[in-house]
Structures are given as C-alpha cells and as structure tokens.
Amino acid sequence: MNFETIIGLEVHVELKTNSKIFSPSTNEFGSDPNTNVNPIDLGYPGTLPVLNEEAVNFAMKAAMALNCEIATDTKFDRKNYFYPDNPKAYQISQFDQPIGENGWIEIEVNGEKKKIGITRLHLEEDAGKLTHGEDGYSYVDFNRQGTPLIEIVSEPDMRSPEEAYAYLEKLKNIIQYTGVSDVKMQEGSLRCDANISLRPIGQEEFGTKAELKNLNSFSYVQKGLEFEEKRQEKELLSGGEILQETRRYDEKTKETILMRVKEGSDDYRYFPEPDLVPLYIDEEWKERVRSEIPELPDARLERYINELGLSEYDANVLTASKQMSDFFEEATAEGADMKQVSNWLMGEVSAYMNKHYKELDELAITPEALAKMINLIEDGTISSKIAKKVFAELVENGGDPQKIVEEKGLVQISDPAQLKQIVNEVLDQNEQSIIDFKNGKNKAKGFLVGQIMKATKGQANPPLVNKILAEELNNR
C-alpha cells in the first residue's frame, strides 16, 4: 500500500516591538535574566494588561504580506494551562477571531510552483524560558514573558518534508522583508511545530496526526518530518495504529521521541479575556498599515529580472535574503556595476559568511566600501587579484578601499614603459621558455606571465602584461 504525506506547520514569530504586548517592559533579546519584567507580565493581583498598538500594526502588516484577510472585529482569549514558565497559569491569545485568515504563499520545489494556504494568523503573548540545569534545578527567566508573538498556521497543503522546508524559507523571507521581526531561529524569534499524518493514496479523509516539537532549525524540521514519515508508514504497514501525540526530535539519535498525548483545544478551556475589550479595526487603519508595507521578495525578484536585467539565478540568490538584497541596492546606488556587485556578494562575501558562520550585518564591510573597491577594479587602479587582498582587509576591519590600496602599496602597475622593462628582464632570465614558445609550446607563455606577476607581486595589469609580452616575444 502506498501512502500520501500530509504536513501542516505552526510557526511562532516574535515581533520586534519596543515594548511587550501588554506591559511597558522592554522587549529586548539578550538581557540578564529577569531584568525586563513587570508585575503585569507576572500576573500580579490588581494589574491589568494594556494592548500595544505597535504589536497590532506589526501583526496586520505580516498578515497582509501573507495575503490574509484582515478581521474587522477581533478579540483576545485566555488559554488556560499550568507550566513553570507561565506565571499567570494562562496565556492571552486569540481563539475564534484571529487578526488574519485565509492567506497563502507560493513556494517552488524542483522547478514546480505551488500555493500553500494559511489558515490563520493570530496575536498572543510568549511564555518565559525554562532551563534545566545539570545541578538538578530548573531555572526560569521571565524576560520573554509577554513578548508579542504571531502564530501562523498553515493549511495541511504540504506533501513532503522538502515542501515544508521551502515553505519555511519563503515565510521567513517575507516576514524579514516586512521588518516586523528578525526571524532568527537561534535567538528564538522564529519557532516551528510540525503536524504530519499519512493516508492511503486516493483517500480523502486525513489520517491521525502527530505533532513534532524541538525543531531548532529548518534542516531539523525536514529531518524530523522525514523520520516521522518513515515511522508512521512502518506502523501502518504492520497493522498498527497512529496515536494523536506530541513528539520531539532528538538531534543525536535523529529520531522522534514521544513527549505526551496531544491535548485538544477543549483542554485549554478558552474563554474571552475579561481584562481586554474587543478590538475594532476599520478600513482606514487597515489602509494606513498596508501603505507601510515595503517591497516584498517576489516583487523585488521580478524587478531585478525585468528592470535590472539580472539573470533569474542571480535575482533569486540576492532576494532570498533581505540583508543581501538591501546591501546590493545600496552598493549599486553608489555607482558600482550591478553585475560585479552581484558576483562579489554571491562569491567572496557569501563564502566568508559561510566559513565564519556570520550574518551580513556582522561583517565590517559596508555597501559603500564594496562599491568603491569595485570601481577601483573598473578604473584599473587594482586588479581582481589585488582586490581580494583589499576585500580581506575590508571584511575584517572595514575602512576606505582607496586608503588601503595606498597604505599597503597595492596600486596596479599600468605604466607601459615600466611593464616593458619588467617583461624584458623576465625574458632575459628565461631564454628556454622563449625557444619553447617559438616551437609552439603555448604553456611557455603562461609560465612567463606567471614569472612577470611574481616579479611584480601580482600588481601588474594582466591585460597590459599579455599585450606587451606578445609584442616582445615577436621581437625576439
């Protein structure tokens, strides 16, 4: 029997508002434990939540970017559960009237495009962070308590772990472009739970799903789903039953492990939040937020191809990261050739980032500096080979490319008379290579070019070297 895989994802995104969703506490990552905490966050008696308008605007902006319908009437609800990182014993969330519904995004896998539906996008508050120490104690940091979150729930439209990976990449990219979140998984500002079930091919009814947690990277999402796909298939083929349960992905064993039997929404005893009035979002408010949405990745991709004339490959690579795309825009605005900027970003810059595990905004090089360096290549001041030395300095320490070239004596030798003298000195020292070249051995010319570059420490103008060398060889 063959099975069809059904996957849906629930993605939590922390919004980078200045303050928390219901209190004036600072919303900042990386502070000392329990320093960004307020009595409202902890649910002290007598405290009342006040809704952060910026969080609502950010949620609407994200929902609009994901093609959602924006609610006119919405409200907040209490989700009741007890856990040490939840001091109020309830979470303020949205149950039956989310801020956004019926959205979609388009993904591409193996050259095939596909729309993935988004069921809903709702606002809620985050819980604290629980850390289990090796000393047998558990420690809780309430800095994250009350951080504004949006939860984005997809339709069960994905049919493979590869599609789930592509969906996450596209979703992250869109949210990043809106500017409402940093969407950094390593900092917890993007978290993902996955639901997966199998059904016999041709059957319309869904199978029993399992929920996967502890998915700390996009690759773990894919690996966890791949394992769970095989586990469920094996269980079904042996006549077993799939239970509705929550499982976690173990990075060491590369397996999913049972955590608990899955709760249903009834277990949370949702009811309307009594301390917050319902929210009315009129058309004027919606249009004001819509006007603030910047150019999104698909629109930028189309512009790069149709207006700038970039290849589809280059445009896809550049727009896959807002940081990379913004860097490209700023560098070309400084007058650098766009193809050269694209080549450097996809080549040397990306290679450095991958080698050192750094983001683009962590590098010392600026768009202005890269543009100046490219212009130095274009006007013949430095060669492409010398440029790599300049780049190495810029990416580590920053600075002005012109000054680096002057201080390190890296200016390209382009004086014909000076180069002619060096070429003849090299020829005088390598008479056998001249004979070999005259006898049709073209490798001899390559050897001579190498000797000239060595004599000039790589600073000779390559096209000019080739021209003068050809002339002098003919004269011998």
From Swiss-Prot:
UniProt keyword annotations, A-Z: ATP-binding, Ligase, Nucleotide-binding, Protein biosynthesis
GO biological process: glutaminyl-tRNAGln biosynthesis via transamidation; translation
Any one Gene Ontology molecular-function term assigned to this protein's record: glutaminyl-tRNA synthase (glutamine-hydrolyzing) activity
Xref: Pfam families: GatB_N (PF02934), GatB_Yqey (PF02637)
Reactions listed under catalytic activity: L-glutamyl-tRNA(Gln) + L-glutamine + ATP + H2O = L-glutaminyl-tRNA(Gln) + L-glutamate + ADP + phosphate + H(+); L-aspartyl-tRNA(Asn) + L-glutamine + ATP + H2O = L-asparaginyl-tRNA(Asn) + L-glutamate + ADP + phosphate + 2 H(+)
EC number assigned by the record: 6.3.5.-
Domain of life: Bacteria
Top-level class of the enzyme under EC nomenclature: ligase
Annotated PANTHER family: GLUTAMYL-TRNA GLN AMIDOTRANSFERASE SUBUNIT B MITOCHONDRIAL AND PROKARYOTIC PET112-RELATED, GLUTAMYL-TRNA(GLN) AMIDOTRANSFERASE SUBUNIT B, MITOCHONDRIAL
Subunit structure: Heterotrimer of A, B and C subunits.
Family, per entry: Belongs to the GatB/GatE family. GatB subfamily.
Role, per record: Allows the formation of correctly charged Asn-tRNA(Asn) or Gln-tRNA(Gln) through the transamidation of misacylated Asp-tRNA(Asn) or Glu-tRNA(Gln) in organisms which lack either or both of asparaginyl-tRNA or glutaminyl-tRNA synthetases. The reaction takes place in the presence of glutamine and ATP through an activated phospho-Asp-tRNA(Asn) or phospho-Glu-tRNA(Gln).
Protein name: Aspartyl/glutamyl-tRNA(Asn/Gln) amidotransferase subunit B
Source species of the chain: Oceanobacillus iheyensis (strain DSM 14371 / CIP 107618 / JCM 11309 / KCTC 3954 / HTE831)
